[in-house]
A protein has these predicted regions:
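A conserved beta-strand element that flanks and buttresses the S-adenosyl-L-methionine
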Residues: 105
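Conserved class I S-adenosyl-L-methionine
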Residues: 1-42, 53-57, 74-77, 132-163, ...
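Short alpha-helix
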Residues: 163-178
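Conserved Class I S-adenosyl-L-methionine
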Residues: 51, 166, 181-255
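Class I SAM-dependent methyltransferase SAM/SAH-binding core
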Residues: 45-47, 51-93
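A short glycine-rich, Lys/Arg-flanked "PGG" loop and its adjoining helix->strand segment in the class I
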Residues: 117-129
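Short catalytic micro-motifs in class I SAM-dependent methyltransferases
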Residues: 108-112
Length: 255
């Protein structure tokens, strides 16, 4: 697989990905929400398998899972969990023949790829007619409090196009053009995440999220540093708040 310059690999964060993304617990919760939408008798390909936390959850529920990831280091960690069923490959160049996959899933992938329309078309190529593709989208959900508002505004300043939000409408339009029918859309819960504003500020400075990786010093000073300062200046900044983590699932079927 050739890595295109605009494709985003998580190679640099593979060693701390699980610790910053909820690990196997969140993977199991995600898998539980996907399971009822999949055929337990058919293998599942996870496109963008990462370290395998969701795939592990699906396997524990009785599914046969295989997957691909752009990052060799992430794929290596997935193999430790799942065995030799993980390949290094680009979501835009899947290493499978036409119409050979029965069902596929992608969790938190489409906002990271160079061109979601290309990836959706590639998954459609690989799926059999009638096969399902479950994917997730961030959507356009308004911030629920001042912490989320500060994060929302920061991301909008860093990406004024709003592409990071992975708007459902954009995903659905691209999916239909790729040969999919929209079967279902739903919002599930991955449970509550306790965090204080100060903890969020600390996490930002650790740069765990991909949109923080390649900022210039000027961007950091102009956008990120003021956000960190504002988070720490909130009243009771060291008191934890509880946030429900939504999982917005789109169910597509290959025509």
């Amino acid at each position: 697989m050739s890595e295109r310059p605009s494709s985003l690999s998580f190679e640099r964060i593979a060693d701390r990905y699980d610790a910053t993304r909820g690990g196997e617990q969140r993977g199991r919760r995600t898998a539980a929400n996907l399971a009822s939408l999949l055929d337990p008798a058919a293998p599942v390909m996870e496109v963008g398998i990462g370290t395998g936390i969701v795939a592990l959850g699906l396997r524990e529920l009785g599914f046969t899972v295989l997957g691909v990831d752009l990052s060799p280091a992430m794929a290596q960690r997935a193999r430790r969990r799942l065995g030799p069923v993980v390949a290094v490959a680009d979501a835009a160049q899947l290493p499978v023949a036409d119409a050979t996959i029965q069902q596929a899933v992608s969790v938190w992938l489409l906002h990271l790829v160079a061109d979601r329309a290309v990836v959706l078309a590639e998954v459609a190529r690989a799926l059999r007619s009638g096969g399902r593709y479950l994917c997730t989208a961030w959507g356009r959900v308004p911030p629920r409090d001042e912490v989320e508002r500060l994060l929302f505004d920061m991301r909008n300043q860093l990406d004024p196009t709003g592409g990071w939000r992975d708007d459902e409408r954009q995903v659905l339009d691209a999916a239909r053009s790729a040969g999919f029918t929209v079967v279902d859309q739903r919002v599930a819960s991955l449970g509550e995440v306790p965090q204080s504003p100060a903890e969020v500020a600390d996490k930002i400075e650790e740069k765990p999220w991909s949109y923080l990786w390649d900022l210039t010093d000027a961007q950091w000073r102009a956008v990120v540093a003021p956000t960190v300062a504002a988070l720490r200046a909130l009243p009771d900044a060291h008191l934890q708040r509880r946030y429900d983590m939504p999982l917005r699932i789109i169910v597509l079927q290959r025509r």
